[in-house]
């Protein structure tokens, strides 16, 4: 039987760990709620941008924009991997890497130049461990990505695409579907595609398909602003989804750790009680034996 004092010491240690994991769970829950509110607001903004694009498409415009053009030959592509700066979030980062690695491998088999960028220390280190070096590393993002920071990254990608330095941009991130479901996905953000593709989701269920719109100063000038903004908003939404999913993963992981610690404490308490009972019984038997020896 294990020593009662050692069991009690271990039980106290696990209780302290449970306090830490419980605190981290509460912090992750609070951060999740804040991140969720920001993601919901960004979703509403994205929908409005999509509606504007839909109306431009409904206007029957014959317009061209560099971001809408499909390249006949892809020579250079960038892959942006969105991971976290911190751990203790379950399989969040492992899932991202499992999704990113096959895509990077397949792209390198068919495209001459594949450049990998990463957001988050865990992503950078995870890729490096697997022999993949990253060119750009974005380590400033935590649980609340700022639009200004993402906009700078987006403008860099836009400039590279327009000047022909890259022909494609893939983003690997965890898409937030619900509190119980988050999925690591890959989205091609550049090129954006056609106006018609942009308008598919916005036109569903709309009741103003027969309305006529007047664009001032012109539909073309609006398009020049809307198309780059559409890309920036989409990239920002990827960062927000990743942030929400990270907090959900951490919240679930810490909740599981807290519950496991509770189960271990119960088991150790039972073992401690048995050990203590055995120790007391032994001491009583020693006393009885001593008394009998004195009487004899």
Curated annotation (Swiss-Prot):
Record's function text: Produces ATP from ADP in the presence of a proton gradient across the membrane. The gamma chain is believed to be important in regulating ATPase activity and the flow of protons through the CF(0) complex.
Membrane topology: Peripheral membrane protein
GO annotation terms (biological process): proton motive force-driven ATP synthesis; proton motive force-driven plasma membrane ATP synthesis
Record-linked Pfam families: ATP-synt
Record bears the keyword RNA-binding: no
InterPro entries: ATP_synth_F1_ATPase_gsu (IPR035968), ATP_synth_F1_gsu (IPR000131)
Source species taxonomy: Bacteria, Pseudomonadati, Planctomycetota, Planctomycetia, Pirellulales
GO cellular component annotations of the record: plasma membrane; proton-transporting ATP synthase complex
Name of the protein in its database record: ATP synthase gamma chain
Quaternary structure and partners: F-type ATPases have 2 components, CF(1) - the catalytic core - and CF(0) - the membrane proton channel. CF(1) has five subunits: alpha(3), beta(3), gamma(1), delta(1), epsilon(1). CF(0) has three main subunits: a, b and c.
Alphabetically ordered keywords of this record: ATP synthesis, Cell inner membrane, Cell membrane, CF(1), Hydrogen ion transport, Ion transport, Membrane, Transport
């Amino acid at each position: 039987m294990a020593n009662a004092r050692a069991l009690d010491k271990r039980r106290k240690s696990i209780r302290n760990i449970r306090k830490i994991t419980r605190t981290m769970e509460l912090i992750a829950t609070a951060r999740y709620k804040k991140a969720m509110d920001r993601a919901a607001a960004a979703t509403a903004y994205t929908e409005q941008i999509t509606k504007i694009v839909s109306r431009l498409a409904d206007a029957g415009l014959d317009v061209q924009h560099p971001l809408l053009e499909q390249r006949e030959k892809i020579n250079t592509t960038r892959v942006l991997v969105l991971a976290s700066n911190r751990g203790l979030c379950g399989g969040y980062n492992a899932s991202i890497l499992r999704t990113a690695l096959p895509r990077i491998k397949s792209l390198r088999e068919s495209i001459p130049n594949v450049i990998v960028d990463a957001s988050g220390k865990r992503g950078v280190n995870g890729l490096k461990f697997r022999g993949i070096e990253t060119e750009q590393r974005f380590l400033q993002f935590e649980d609340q990505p700022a639009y200004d920071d993402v906009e700078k990254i987006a403008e860099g990608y836009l400039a590279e695409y327009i000047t022909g330095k890259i022909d494609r941009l893939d983003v690997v991130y965890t898409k937030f579907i619900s509190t119980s479901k988050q999925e690591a996905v890959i989205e091609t953000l550049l090129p954006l595609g056609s106006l018609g593709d942009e308008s598919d989701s916005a036109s569903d269920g709309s009741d103003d398909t027969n309305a006529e719109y007047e664009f001032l100063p012109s539909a073309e000038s609006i398009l020049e602003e809307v198309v780059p903004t559409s890309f920036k908003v989409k990239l920002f939404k990827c960062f927000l989804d990743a942030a929400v999913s990270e907090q959900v993963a951490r919240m679930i992981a810490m909740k599981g750790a807290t519950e496991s610690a509770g189960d271990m404490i119960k088991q150790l308490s039972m073992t401690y009680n048995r050990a203590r009972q055995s120790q007391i019984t032994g001491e009583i038997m020693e006393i009885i034996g001593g008394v009998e020896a004195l009487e004899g």
